[in-house]
């Protein structure tokens, strides 16, 4: 509101939505089409959520003409922001709203993933709850599938309900090409170039579990989401190595069985010969 201190009240009312979108801390929001916000069907149930609902709606739609004191104006302004946020959560899951958020996502307006292995992948705002004043907004990375806190304190104060818990999932269903291929690359702790034993053992176990899961998915002909070329080649190499190891184990087992059978045969033959000699000795005596 400080941006409009020098402006007249009529100018302020005329540019409320423009002012709201351009205000510092509101970069995560997109501009809601006037046709959407003036359609009462899209606002169903919000009158019970917002104080001074009608005045707030009039302010958002630039028809506010109530002559009131500063305290009342500030209260209505706060209600208008809250109402805009609640409508925003509904708008961004529409075709037009998704398109606007897509444009902001391409420009990385929501920030980039701080995880090194994600290579500055764009983030997408999301809520952990659909209930207002419950949890602040978080940022979702589609590459590592994890969520992060906004860097700016202004953004961290935004209500997560203004984006909702379903938006980011709907977004990537509508734009499936934006879902990055899963990478098997991971950080391996080292000391002077050598892998840390405990961490290395954990990584080997995790890799074996992941590879086993991918083999099961491949047998079931289910898309795993991992890169195909190099990863499938790795799996094929692993399968070949396992087959070779199994063949070697079978050969060793067969050799052990044959050796055991030979030893048993030799022992039986030796026992027969010993018995014959003993019988011959008794006869001579």
UniProtKB/Swiss-Prot annotation:
Residues 260-272 have a biased composition (Low complexity). One of its GO terms (biological process) is regulation of transcription by RNA polymerase III. GO terms for molecular function: protein kinase regulator activity. GO terms for cellular component: cytoplasm; protein kinase CK2 complex; UTP-C complex. It comes from the Eukaryota. PROSITE patterns: CK2_BETA. Belongs to the casein kinase 2 subunit beta family. This is Casein kinase II subunit beta-2. The lineage of its organism: Eukaryota, Fungi, Dikarya, Ascomycota, Pezizomycotina.
């Amino acid at each position: 509101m400080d941006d409009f201190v020098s402006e007249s009240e009529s100018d302020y009312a005329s540019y409320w939505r423009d002012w709201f979108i351009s205000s510092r801390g509101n970069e995560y929001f997109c501009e809601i089409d006037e046709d959407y916000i003036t359609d009462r069907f899209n606002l169903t149930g919000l009158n019970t959520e917002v104080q001074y609902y009608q005045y707030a709606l009039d302010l958002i739609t630039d028809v506010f003409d109530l002559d009131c004191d500063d305290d009342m104006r500030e209260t209505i302004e706060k209600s208008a922001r809250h109402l805009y946020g609640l409508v925003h959560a509904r708008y961004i899951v529409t075709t037009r709203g998704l398109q606007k958020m897509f444009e902001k996502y391409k420009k990385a307006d929501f920030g980039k993933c701080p995880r090194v292995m994600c290579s500055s992948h764009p983030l997408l705002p999301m809520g952990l709850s659909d209930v207002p004043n419950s949890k602040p907004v978080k940022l979702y990375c589609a590459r590592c599938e994890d969520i992060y806190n906004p860097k700016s304190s202004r953004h961290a104060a935004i209500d997560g309900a203004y984006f909702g818990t379903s938006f980011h999932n709907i977004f990537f269903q509508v734009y499936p090409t934006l879902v990055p291929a899963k990478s098997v690359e991971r950080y391996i702790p080292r000391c002077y170039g050598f892998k840390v034993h405990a961490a290395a053992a954990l990584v080997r176990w995790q890799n074996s579990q992941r590879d086993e899961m991918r083999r099961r998915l491949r047998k079931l002909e289910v898309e795993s989401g991992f890169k195909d070329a190099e990863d499938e080649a790795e799996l094929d190499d692993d399968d070949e190595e396992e087959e070779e190891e199994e063949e070697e184990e079978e050969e060793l087992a067969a050799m052990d069985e044959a050796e055991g059978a030979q030893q048993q045969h030799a022992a039986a033959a030796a026992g027969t010969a010993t018995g014959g000699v003993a019988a011959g000795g008794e006869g001579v005596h």
